[in-house]
């Protein structure tokens, strides 16, 4: 789904929605009558809810003067903002606790998406809370359950505290708790902090942003994460007596596909819109692992392209890191060209399993493609793909949230300064408003001559 530019579906899926009214599931199986807990059902319920909220907004716009709270000292209608804060904190705590204790654990709900580090075995399943130090591992889904249960309890207790205890008068005045702009400023702070956090967890990866749903991170390419795992599996198979062809044939195509630079979210660009499939095309199949050897039988390895390069010289090195062959920029001065060194390429696993190519033009073609990781065949005709890499939803999510978090950070500073230094900006003490208001007193500023309404 991340290759197709799906943005909302991965978030639904990680919460346990896997079925569609179209009869398909995320795992490729067929289903019948998935009901409300489906992609379309969840989308429809949100559309209906948004409509109801819009109607509620109109109602409250019309009937805005609701006397829900009264100031006990003056008996005048007034918004009790600290009490409203306590109500919202309590309700959000209940929601947080309920999500962790019931939804994530599967006690009353489906659980969440859980997978292995290499994104191969992902499925929705119940998660047991991890209460020890292991719960702080960002890749441990048990920490998600434990955190929501713990944070929910804290939120419930804090909400009850703010419902039952009044803020000290000095603190109330210092933080301008009676001013609704204080609510705006502190709310913006909560939102931008959350946006920065989720931007980090999405870009660097964690249990809540599995690679099966959002695509790999750029650091997995930089560190050769999948390449090392593939090599480890192949070496284990060969050590067990399997041939190279058999060993590479046991590598899941999914794992090989992760080890391809086109899935690196940093390879796209902010000005290249559209899904990844509009770039290099729709992946049609793995051709196999390309192994290069020179005329002396020495195995050569193509140096892979770093993330932030659009073009990179084709260099083949041996096991000791010594350059043995290349595709030269100037053939007249070349010493290590494919033709001179006599390089051939053999494929293991995939569609070209067991085939060897000695033609220099073909060898150079696959050497260029091996720069980009495992070699895949792509269908570029269906979507008229232009061959220019696009970015995954992982990068777009990160960019959007960090950008808005930065804007909201300045918004928090702006509105916080406005509410705290309101008297400085206005030049008038806010408590003097009534005294200088025309018509409030028979004699301007004399509080003993309050004008009585008849």
From Swiss-Prot:
Name of the protein in its database record: Photosystem II CP47 reaction center protein
Quaternary structure, from the entry: PSII is composed of 1 copy each of membrane proteins PsbA, PsbB, PsbC, PsbD, PsbE, PsbF, PsbH, PsbI, PsbJ, PsbK, PsbL, PsbM, PsbT, PsbX, PsbY, PsbZ, Psb30/Ycf12, at least 3 peripheral proteins of the oxygen-evolving complex and a large number of cofactors. It forms dimeric complexes.
Gene Ontology molecular-function annotations: chlorophyll binding; electron transporter, transferring electrons within the cyclic electron transport pathway of photosynthesis activity
Function description: One of the components of the core complex of photosystem II (PSII). It binds chlorophyll and helps catalyze the primary light-induced photochemical processes of PSII. PSII is a light-driven water:plastoquinone oxidoreductase, using light energy to abstract electrons from H(2)O, generating O(2) and a proton gradient subsequently used for ATP formation.
Topology relative to the membrane: Multi-pass membrane protein
Primary gene name: psbB
Localization terms from the record: Plastid, Chloroplast thylakoid membrane
Organism: Ostreococcus tauri
Stored InterPro entries: PS_antenna-like, PS_II_antenna-like_sf, PSII_PsbB
One Pfam family hit: PSII
């Amino acid at each position: 789904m991340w290759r197709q530019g799906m943005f909302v579906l991965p978030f639904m899926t990680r919460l346990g929605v896997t079925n569609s009214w179209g009869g398909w599931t995320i795992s490729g199986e067929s289903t019948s009558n998935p009901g409300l807990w489906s992609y379309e059902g969840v989308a429809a319920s949100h559309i209906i809810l948004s409509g109801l909220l819009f109607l509620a907004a109109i109602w409250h716009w019309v009937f805005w003067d609701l006397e829900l709270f009264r100031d006990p000292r003056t008996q005048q209608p007034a918004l009790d903002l600290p009490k409203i804060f306590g109500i919202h904190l309590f309700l959000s705590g209940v929601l947080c606790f309920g999500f962790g204790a019931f939804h994530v654990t599967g006690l009353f709900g489906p659980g969440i998406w859980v997978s292995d580090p290499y994104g191969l075995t992902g499925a929705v399943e119940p998660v047991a809370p991890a209460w020890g130090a292991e719960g702080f591992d960002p890749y441990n889904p048990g920490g998600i359950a434990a955190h929501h249960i713990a944070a929910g309890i804290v939120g419930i207790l804090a909400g009850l505290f703010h419902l039952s205890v009044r803020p000290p008068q000095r603190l109330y005045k210092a933080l301008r708790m009676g001013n609704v702009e204080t609510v705006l400023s502190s709310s913006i702070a909560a939102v931008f902090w959350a946006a920065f956090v989720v931007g980090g967890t999405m870009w660097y990866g964690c249990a809540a942003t599995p690679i099966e749903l959002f695509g790999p991170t750029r650091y997995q390419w930089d560190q050769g994460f999948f390449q090392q795992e593939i090599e480890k599996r192949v070496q284990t198979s060969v050590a067990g007596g399997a041939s190279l062809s058999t060993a590479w044939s046991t590598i899941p195509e999914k794992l090989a596909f992760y080890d391809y630079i086109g899935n690196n979210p940093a390879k796209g660009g902010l000005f290249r819109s559209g899904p990844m499939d509009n770039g290099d095309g729709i992946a049609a199949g793995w051709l196999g692992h390309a192994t290069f050897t020179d005329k002396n039988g020495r195995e050569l390895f193509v140096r892979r392209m770093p993330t932030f390069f659009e073009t990179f010289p084709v260099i083949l090195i041996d096991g000791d890191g010594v350059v043995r062959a290349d595709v030269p920029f100037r053939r007249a001065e070349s010493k290590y060209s494919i033709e001179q060194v006599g390089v051939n390429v053999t494929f293991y696993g995939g569609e070209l399993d067991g085939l060897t190519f000695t033609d220099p033009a073909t060898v150079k073609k696959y050497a260029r493609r091996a720069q980009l990781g495992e070699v895949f065949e792509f269908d570029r005709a269906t979507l008229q793909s232009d061959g220019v890499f696009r970015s995954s939803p992982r990068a777009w999510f990160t960019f959007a949230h960090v950008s808005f978090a930065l804007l909201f950070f300045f918004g928090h500073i702006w509105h916080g300064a406005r509410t705290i230094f309101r008297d400085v900006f206005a030049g008038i003490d806010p408590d003097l408003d009534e005294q200088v208001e025309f018509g409030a007193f028979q004699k301007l500023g004399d509080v003993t001559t309050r004008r009585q309404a008849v």
